[in-house]
Amino acid sequence: MGFTLLIDNYDSFTWNIYADLASVGGNPFVVRNDKITLKEIEGMFADGELERIVISPGPGHPRTDSGVSRDVIAWGMGKLPILGVCMGLECIVDLLGGEIAYAGEIKHGKTSLVQHDSIGVFHNLPQFLSSTRYHSLSAQIQSLPSVLQVTSTTKESGVIMGVRHRTFTVEAVQYHPESCMSEGGRGLMANFIQMKGGKWGGENAWCGVPAEGEGEQPKAKTNGAPSLPTILNKIHAQRLLDVEQAEKIPATTPANVSTSLSLYTSPPLINFRGRMVSTPHTAVMAEIKRASPSKGDIAPTASAPQQALKYALAGASVISVLTEPTWFKGSLLDMLAVRNAVDSLPNRPAILRKDFVLSKYMIDEARLYGADTVLLIVAMLEPQQLKELYDYSVSLGMEPLVEVNNPTELSLALEIGSKVIGVNNRNLHDFNVDMSTTSRVNAALNGRDVVLCALSGISSHEDVEKYVKEGVKGVLVGEALMRASDTKAFLRSLIGLPPLEVVPKPRPLVKICGIRSTNDAKLAINAGADLLGVILVPGTKRCISTSTAREISALVQSARSQSSSKPLEPSLSSPWFTSQSALLSSRRKPLLVGVFQNQSLSDILSAVDEIGLDLVQLHGDEPQAWAKFIPVPVVKVFRVSPEGIVRGGEIRRPGLNQAILLDAGGASGGGGEGKAFPWEHAKRLIQSGEVGSEGHVPLPVILAGGLTPENVGQAIEQAGEGVWCVDVSSGVEGEGGKVKEKVEAFVKAVRG
């Protein structure tokens, strides 16, 4: 009677395997992986005693901790049946060129339901076996050798639980069928010991595995077992469950989501296609990606809004936010935070919901949480469903990104009228990457008016350059950008842009405040002041009437009409205050600023209209949010105490007031008292930088408080390059108002 050689990789479960083999007539003979040689095993086989081999579980990695196991497998394939368990599977996959890596989950003594193909060692076993797992490594489907096929996976997460050689009688399972908590273990062993010889077919035809050349296994077995799902199918099933659960939560029922949309609680849209085509260079769709089925964890603790700001400030045209939670570790809250983070940028990136969208409800979710577009994957949708979802998305103002992987899918995308098509170089059924996919699909477009994008696997300028030559307008980059140490430099190099030049900062603008007459205004204008401030606060010593303010406004407008300055487009990748200060600096001058303090919004709006103000300065405790309702740019004052405490609101908050004015915290709180605050506090605030810039972009401020012709140069030097304007009032005054010599001296001291 022949025997089963059981190679023990120093694991206690080897005893259980021994017991199962013995109970089904396998006649096991156990030897540890370093206590036998391949020559001895060859002798056993030559003597006709050795009929089959089992490679046991074991700790460690197959290359370093499996002893003779790999050599035994290499020798035995094609000669006799081989079964690998856990470490045994890893040995087989690794030996044949596959990748053994982190499984995406750690399981030690936990059970999972395993679905299988119902043939080979799984012949006549029921589906969804409860199976015990002790491992953190597994075979990676994207690198699985072509000679192997997947035979089983976990139902809930799609991790490979079994593989089979396509030609030889070699089977392996990742889980532990020998455990007392596993179902069907002895049935699996009984199937294995019935196998004969080294190849499928012939006397092994009973188990259903076709011999080489007889074709692939059928899609479904006669016992009703489902065909083995691809990764895409697993994700599809999981997302259906996720959506079903979300729809049952009271706050996110379809009716409540629809009501929220009807109340316009969602952020306003921008045109996705328009944002792509308006980009003067190759449009980069920068992806926020914490993990993936193929790579496992990439940046699991990454902050989505922080990463989004990095991308936006680096020049990304689109920010792709993965919202799938199980495999990609994303969420809808990530997308909403991203949308809010980039909202204040002058030409913000479009926001893409990158997910496996299967229903109108998911499109409603996307719109509610700030998306400008959604991804529709042709491979996941029936043609009619694809058309319905495309039309519905367009009806909400969102032109979808339609993803294809081959010319057949491209035809479906074109048939429904897609305007932006992304070609995924990664086949979502097996997650293999083929960088030529985009080129093949592009050739099938035949010059149609479609914005074509290349998706996935792009990590170098050479990748991008190749596609651009073929007419590709945009590229999606995820992992490479997430891992880049310098996001802006990497993004620019990716699309072939030179490094940004350091442009010297211009000298600050000059604001002469407290203008009380047309004579004061003429002095300031003739001296070269950029901004003139009029006080419109009743009860203060410099307050002027509306009629006087109108006269000053007319004088300012007349002087401005002779200016040759032209508005400039702000940098598309500049933060809020930097872009706003650039816009104000580029306008024809002088500009008239109306100063208000703790007055009603209606009074402010009336004054803007009656006087013709160019800017409004909120000098009291007004809410910053008022800036949204005032039709001209708003300067908000923040008061700095001698100790450096700042009062007045959220000084670095973007998207509301266009400018920040730093003044001393005087007793009256009104300013204009000739008091300065320590300028090192201004430097500290400036160096804190714009939000999202990590201190690399100085916070632009207007410096005020106790400035004079004698000290303004020192103040600018001490505060640093973030001072884009200086504001003076009492420092250039005499008994009767502004003093010509002082005004001229102040402007000269600033300009140098």
Swiss-Prot record:
Gene3D superfamilies: 3.40.50.880, Aldolase class I. InterPro entries: Aldolase_TIM, Anthranilate_synth_II, Class_I_gatase-like, GATASE, Indole-3-glycerol_P_synth, Indole-3-glycerol_P_synth_dom, Indole-3-GlycerolPSynthase_CS, PRAI_dom. Pathway: Amino-acid biosynthesis; L-tryptophan biosynthesis; L-tryptophan from chorismate: step 1/5; Amino-acid biosynthesis; L-tryptophan biosynthesis; L-tryptophan from chorismate: step 3/5; Amino-acid biosynthesis; L-tryptophan biosynthesis; L-tryptophan from chorismate: step 4/5. The active site is at 86 (nucleophile), 176 (for gatase activity), 178 (for gatase activity). It comes from the Eukaryota. PANTHER family: INDOLE-3-GLYCEROL-PHOSPHATE SYNTHASE, TRYPTOPHAN BIOSYNTHESIS PROTEIN. This is Multifunctional tryptophan biosynthesis protein. It comes from Cryptococcus neoformans var. grubii serotype A (strain H99 / ATCC 208821 / CBS 10515 / FGSC 9487) (Filobasidiella neoformans var. grubii). The lineage of its organism: Eukaryota, Fungi, Dikarya, Basidiomycota, Agaricomycotina.
